[in-house]
Amino acid sequence: MSKQSPTRKLRQTVYDASLKVMFTLRPERIHGLMNKALGVVDGVAPLNRTMEKIIAVHDDSLSQEVFGVTFPRPLGLAAGFDKNASMADAWGAVGFGYAELGTVTASPQPGNPTPRLFRLPADKAILNRMGFNNLGAAEVATNLSNRKSTDVIGINIGKTKVVPAEHAVDDYRRSASLLGDLADYLVVNVSSPNTPGLRDLQAVESLRPILAAVQESTTVPVLVKIAPDLSDEDIDAVADLAVELKLAGIVATNTTISREGLNTPAGEVEAMGAGGISGAPVAARSLEVLKRLYARVGKEMVLISVGGISTPEQAWERITSGATLLQGYTPFIYGGPDWIRDIHLGIAKQLKAHGLRNIADAVGSELEWKN
């Protein structure tokens, strides 16, 4: 990356100092404070527009049409932050090209008992066992219907915890029916480790009727989100099913239940308990899964890569390895809006360095990063 400007350095210094203060608070308390701040951006249109002009990267080379939707920039907010679409109009203002909201379940639910969110600063990671806490599809639909912006929005839907697996199809269908027309795309989440039995629904025989029901319930593109902990054979099976059902794409990957290779002392991690880890520790496996998916089905559907994309170099590698779109959550917590800006500026610079007119030309190209 080019040398940082004094303004950029100042912004990052201020954010880093703020982060140190915030990290003295409980993680969910920080999340609540960030929600309130973003809620102001969401609700004040002039502020929203001003921030978008200042913070977001505006470069025609970053814009692309994906499954019939125009994405102005490739990096989006990953699901898990804006669970209730309460800040749906704020994400473009902080620089994202789109946002995936949720996870939303058909019925409201409180999620798992607290504490359920933990920081691993030594790993630039977060461990969570939130358990799909949300207001339910009907309430989220109301929030979405009150949106003022035309920013691209995806909705991530999951299974209500109390609904048994044998009734999962109807549960997902209900969410899709309520939310589908209010989103630009839907993602079927069967890969969170924090709802008992949910990951079992990734098995093809369980997944097929769920995906088919969601497709029947909406006219918007449908994608499926998978776990990094699937075996290579299971990844292939889900990919083949996605092609068979003509899904719009695959989001890869969710959080990992692996605890290997962490810098955080094992005793501290064990004390945190169960949950999925996001951020830097999942980066290598997420890249592996992306490459496997692209080799198998990349020419037939859109691949959205998420998991530990912390630097512009990593973002470029995901794109050149087959990702049409990118997502992040944990790096946003650690890096703030300038992380989003750096990613987009880095990608635009690489496109220019390689003589490419549009990001679509770089997808799957295997082009190296140019310094």
From Swiss-Prot:
Protein residues bound to FMN: A79, G80, F81, D82, K83, T103, N156, N189, K225, T253, G279, G308, Y329, T330
Main location: membrane
Binding residues annotated for substrate, in chain numbering: K83, N128, R129, M130, G131, F132, N189, N194, N254, T255
Top-rank taxon: Bacteria
Cofactor binding comment, as recorded: Binds 1 FMN per subunit.
Active-site residues (renumbered): S192 (nucleophile)
Membrane topology: Peripheral membrane protein
EC category name: oxidoreductase
UniProt-listed Enzyme Commission number(s): 1.3.5.2
Gene Ontology biological process terms, A to Z: 'de novo' pyrimidine nucleobase biosynthetic process; 'de novo' UMP biosynthetic process
Swiss-Prot/TrEMBL cofactor(s): FMN
Protein's pathway: Pyrimidine metabolism; UMP biosynthesis via de novo pathway; orotate from (S)-dihydroorotate (quinone route): step 1/1
The keyword Transport is annotated on this UniProt entry: no
SUPFAM superfamilies: FMN-linked oxidoreductases
GO cellular component labels: cytoplasm; plasma membrane
Keyword Transit peptide: no
Stored InterPro entries: Aldolase_TIM (IPR013785), DHO_dehydrogenase (IPR050074), Dihydroorotate_DH_2 (IPR005719), Dihydroorotate_DH_cat (IPR005720), Dihydroorotate_DH_CS (IPR001295)
Coiled-coil region list: none
Physiological role: Catalyzes the conversion of dihydroorotate to orotate with quinone as electron acceptor.
Family as reported in the entry's similarity comment: Belongs to the dihydroorotate dehydrogenase family. Type 2 subfamily.
The protein's assembly and partners: Monomer.
Protein name: Dihydroorotate dehydrogenase (quinone)
Organism in which the protein naturally occurs: Corynebacterium glutamicum (strain R)
Gene name of the encoded protein: pyrD
